[in-house]
Amino acid sequence: MSAGATILARGALVGAALVAAGCGAGPAVVARDGAGHEVASAALPASGEFALTYRHSVYKTAAEERFRATDGGFVLDSIASRDGRVLDYYELDGARTREGALWVLRPDRPARFETMPLAATRRGQRTLVAGTRHVPLYGGPVHLKLVVEQ
């Protein structure tokens, strides 16, 4: 194989590996710091669904905010926790159901975001979940902005 063909073959292998690792084209959820630098990201599954998990500061229990990517941003589809008081904390009207051990609130009027500011503290342990990826957002800058990028 010529040197040029070897370089092309290696480039194709690297490109395939990046796509397989979720680093290729396609929408992703990205967390940026105050200066706009990327702190963390995760490729979105085909469904466009992702979540933020965290430890609630008042009730000291796990909670999950579930989102879905849309054209130009994302929507809060539901909030889930083992402790129903977490759902009360949001003060949103909507349908409450059970999913196994979890209480789930589906807001009547889901909040829509282009970007969403959030605090990522060690205490809250905020984590981005997209597909099978769990990306901790805490341990670096505290004040972040979440955005869906195409």
Q: What do these predicted ranges mean?
A:
Residues 10, 82, 86-89:
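Generic hydrophobic/packing signal
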Residues 50, 68, 75-78, 88-150:
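Mature, soluble, non-transmembrane domains
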Residues 11-20:
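Bacterial N-terminal signal peptides
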Residues 1-12:
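Bacterial N-terminal signal peptides that target proteins for export
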Residues 30-83:
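N-terminal secretory signal peptides
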